Amino acid sequence: MVCAQEAYIQLGLSRVMLVPARIPPHKPVDEEPGASHRLEMCRLATRGDEERFEVADLEIRREGPSYTVDTLEELHSSKPDSELFLILGADIAAGLPDWHQAERVVSQATVAVAERPGTSREAVMRALEQVPGGETGRFFDMPEIGISSTMLRQRVRASLSTRYLMPDAVREYIDHHQLYRGSSET
């Protein structure tokens, strides 16, 4: 949510739409909770802040593989006068040349890159320049908060507190549904 908030502020966006994937393509996750749980956690994380953030189930409803280009085209059809930004972390943006129909992705939206430790701006720029139109990407600062989704899942699995590290409603949802707890089988 910090990344979404920073993009909203620094890029002067009117709204940020969170679109959870039905099957996350770029980051396989052990004990993946499923699309419906991820969708609900996004809704809980943005509750009370609907003026800035919207959660959409576009990719979850779609049959078959869900590609970013399809989502962007669907958004363009439903919001033809909107300028779209695709918000990505630097690590993901560096892999954009390998995406399905990457050239169409960058023709549909301005790529907005959250700078993160571990992936240099130069590496991302080189990657974006490999995709015709990608050189129009924009960067925004991401504060180093020392919290990652991997770290949060590890803390949940180890029964360590995640209080103050994520929205209370999301933490309570994870606890209630016993998500990310690991398998009881050995």
Please give the residue ranges for each predicted region.
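Nucleotidyltransferase catalytic core that binds NTPs
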Residues: 1-186
